[in-house]
Amino acid sequence: GDISRNEDYLAYGSDVLAVADGTVASVESALRDEPPQQAPTDIGLAQLGGNSVILDIGGGNYVFLAHLIPGSATVMAGDKVVRGQVLGRLGNSGNTTEPHLHLHVSRAPLPLSGDNVPYVIDRFAFVGSVDADSHFVAGPNAGARTLELPLEGAVIDFPAAP
């Protein structure tokens, strides 16, 4: 598709799901999507994550899911959510040059602050990777993975829930 249109990116508009049961700590949903392939120059520190949802998953841990489409959040602060529940739709808001999901776990209920917490994904399929020239490279050793965290540049797929 046209790399200058957010809507032409495969991930754009995809459902963003809760990765664990928890309570919504905060929601930002009013920031604009940025044009793809252009680094934004007019956003402040508070807008770096763009539209986002922060989940309190207990034990002092918070999940930050960022770069959602404006107005797409389906939850509000204080809502209880369950793993797999739709939180919003993937967009290109904040400090980003193309639609993608920013996800991290930290010990603070604020965007991009606090100590990061290591985590693993319970199951996914490793498909390949993206090389330095942004080309897809299949495998090697493509297939199912459990309790791992994909490396940077990995292309993965999530199988349907059993």
Predicted regions and their residues:
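Short, small/polar residue-rich loop motifs at catalytic or cofactor-binding pockets
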Residues: L10-Y12, G49, A73-T74
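Short histidine-centered loop motifs in beta-beta connectors
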Residues: L17, N61-G84
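A structural signal for short beta-strand/turn segments enriched in small hydrophobics and glycine
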Residues: G22-V24, G78-L90
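Zn2+-dependent peptidoglycan hydrolase active-site motif and core
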Residues: T23-I69
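Short, charged beta-turn/beta-strand-edge "cap" motif at the junction between a beta-strand
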Residues: A30-R32, L87-N95
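Acidic, glycine-rich catalytic/binding loops that coordinate metals and/or anionic ligands
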Residues: I43-Q47, T74, D79, H104-P162
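Histidine-centered catalytic micro-motifs
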Residues: L68-I69, E98-A108
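Short glycine/proline-centered loop/turn elements that form peptide/ligand docking sites
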Residues: T74-M76, N92-P99
